[in-house]
Swiss-Prot record:
Protein name: Adenine deaminase
Keyword Hydrolase part of the UniProt annotation: yes
Source taxon at top rank: Bacteria
Phylogenetic placement of the source organism: Bacteria, Pseudomonadati, Rhodothermota, Rhodothermia, Rhodothermales
Record keywords: Hydrolase, Manganese
Family: Belongs to the metallo-dependent hydrolases superfamily. Adenine deaminase family.
Gene name as annotated: ade
Organism (species): Salinibacter ruber (strain DSM 13855 / M31)
EC identifiers of the protein: 3.5.4.2
Length: 545
């Protein structure tokens, strides 16, 4: 039943850009009236935070469980792109996310995925063409077109790309962008195609060009891509066109903080408090037309209580008048989610990862901790008995992708630097964006054990050293069906195991691994079909002439 109550404090009015003592009266989950007050407790009332672009699945939690974790940090809603599960299950996956999140006191805004699969150079579990996208956009609970990753298609006027953009425009729904590194005239053409936002900027110069082209920028700080430090000076340049987002946030990170962390960091650097809070609370609501309250009379009673605007400790979170979190504890009950999946891969053998030596010079992916992009190096090929092999002493490891959507497939194998493994292997069925099984390892037998642990669990993340540990992800091979705190603890233990037993010093090894198959972000990536140059947008050989 919607709540009715009154609460007093120092109200942070983000529209008037003022702070005043007030009593807020909530009636049936709606803010009935706001009255001036002379004496109020030393606490602040302000609108709740919105994550302006996030893949809920990356937290390895279904929406209902994601909400339980996020409200603890003052988040009351998300702009969520469900293209992870859509790549596995198609429209059924999108409908699953909407249905799982609907009963929870939280505002999920799921978009229509625009690029499923992300490219034609990989195998996914589904394909969403213009008709399927249009049908999703017909729904009132699908308020926008998710990130258009096919920026070459948008720039070149590819009919299927423009059809999806047009489907959103005729329904007066926003179109999200995704254009890492796009500069110059291409930016103007991309924006002219109808793209309104971007969250992929890694340099402030890139962001300025996109702002100049008329786009809005979501400043991203997730578990893999961390762009806050580079982009936050934009708060002094274009505060009215900024939002905050996490994009991809793993369960351990979500347990520790969310958008509140970015707000706190921005405020501590001295940026205007109203500019910062409007970016975190108001701009996503206005841009996407979300039915989320902004602490005004007649709004849904969505707001948070914090101790002060410096420490910004979230004491209480309210959604439609319901107290959903208090002093770091969620009040949303855990409800078991349905399990849906598609996982057809069979176990592999160590011999499946053999690579005949095809030359003296080897093309190697260079992975970068806390970034989605990669580099490329050419090294002398390490060999043994006629095969190209991993060389942990030089941090040259094998990288493999196994097609999860067929029973019979040969792993695609390449080589990578950056993980620093002394031995063993790790594997994951979270492998953007088609979510095959991606693995990195120092030995073929360890690669086989890590991959097979994921295969037998029908989805998960694993690490193989002397033993093998696995975190099962039975929901589409992406999400757990356990409570968020259990998932966070198990994920942390597995990451610690990778550092202690496999020797990696990476901050987020599983997140970094999961993006090595994302072909739409350059430079060098690996799909289940081979080594791919994301800048040239073509397959390349493992060996260099």
């Amino acid at each position: 039943m919607p709540a009715s109550f009154s609460i007093a404090g120092r109200l942070v009015d983000l529209h008037a850009r003022a702070i005043r003592p007030a009593t807020v009266h909530v009636q049936d989950g709606v803010i009935a009236r706001i009255e001036p007050a002379e004496t109020v407790p030393e606490r602040h009332l302000l609108p709740g935070f919105i994550d302006a672009h996030v893949h809920v699945e990356s937290a390895m939690l279904p929406p209902s469980e994601f909400a339980r974790a996020a409200v603890r940090h003052g988040t009351v809603g998300t702009v969520s792109d469900p293209h992870e599960i859509a790549n596995v299950l198609g429209v059924e996956g999108v409908e699953y996310m909407i249905a799982d999140g609907r009963p929870v006191p939280f505002h999920f805004a799921f978009g229509a995925p625009s690029c499923v699969p992300a490219t034609p150079f990989e195998t996914s579990g589904a394909e969403l063409g213009p008709d399927a996208v249009s049908a999703l956009l017909d729904r009132d609970d699908v308020p926008y077109l998710s990130e258009m990753m096919d920026y070459p298609g948008a720039i070149d006027g590819a009919p299927n790309v423009l059809a999806k953009i047009r489907a959103a425009q005729v329904r007066d729904k926003p179109v999200d962008g995704h254009a890492p590194g796009l500069r110059g005239d291409d930016v103007a053409q991309y924006a002219a195609a109808g793209i309104e936002t971007d969250h992929e900027c890694v340099s402030i110069e890139e962001a300025r060009e996109k702002l100049e082209a008329g786009m809005k920028i979501a400043i991203r700080e997730g578990s893999a891509a961390k762009n806050f430090d580079e982009l936050i000076p934009l708060m002094d340049e274009a505060p009215d066109r900024l939002m905050f987002c996490s994009d991809d946030r793993h369960p351990d990170a979500l347990a520790e903080g969310h958008i509140d962390t970015l707000v706190r960091r921005a405020l501590n650097r001295g940026y205007d408090r109203f500019d910062v809070l409007r970016a975190a609370c108001v701009h996503p609501v206005e841009h996407y037309g979300l039915d989320v309250g902004l602490l005004r009379e007649g709004d849904p009673a969505d707001f948070i209580v914090v101790d002060d605007l410096d420490a910004l400790n979230v004491q209480e979170t309210y959604v439609e008048g319901a107290l959903v979190a208090e002093e770091g504890e969620t009040h949303i009950e855990h409800v078991a989610s349905d399990v849906v999946n598609r996982f057809d891969a069979e176990p592999v053998a160590p011999a499946d990862f053999r690579v005949p030596a095809g030359g003296d010079r080897l093309r190697v992916i260079t992975a970068v901790d806390n970034q989605l992009g990669t580099g490329e190096e050419v090294v002398t090929t390490p060999t043994d008995d006629g095969y190209a092999v991993a060389d942990p002493d030089r941090d040259v490891l094998k990288l493999a992708v196994v097609n999860r959507y067929t029973e019979e497939s040969t792993p695609a194998v390449a080589f990578v630097r950056g993980f620093g493994l002394d031995g063993g292997a790790l594997a994951s069925s979270v492998a953007h964006d088609s979510h095959n099984v991606v693995a990195v390892g120092a030995r073929d037998d360890a690669l086989a054990r890590a991959v097979n642990a994921v295969v037998r669990a029908e989805g998960g993340i694993s690490a193989a050293a002397e033993g093998t540990q696995v975190l099962p992800l039975p929901i589409a091979g992406l999400m757990s069906d356990e409570p968020y705190d259990v998932v966070a603890r198990r994920y942390t233990r597995l990451t610690d195991y990778v550092r202690a037993e496999l020797g990696s010093a990476m901050d987020a090894p599983f997140m970094t691994l999961s993006f090595l198959s994302l072909l739409v972000i350059p430079q060098l990536k690996l799909s289940d079909r081979g080594l791919f140059d994301g800048a040239a947008f073509e397959f390349v050989d493992r060996f260099v002439d």
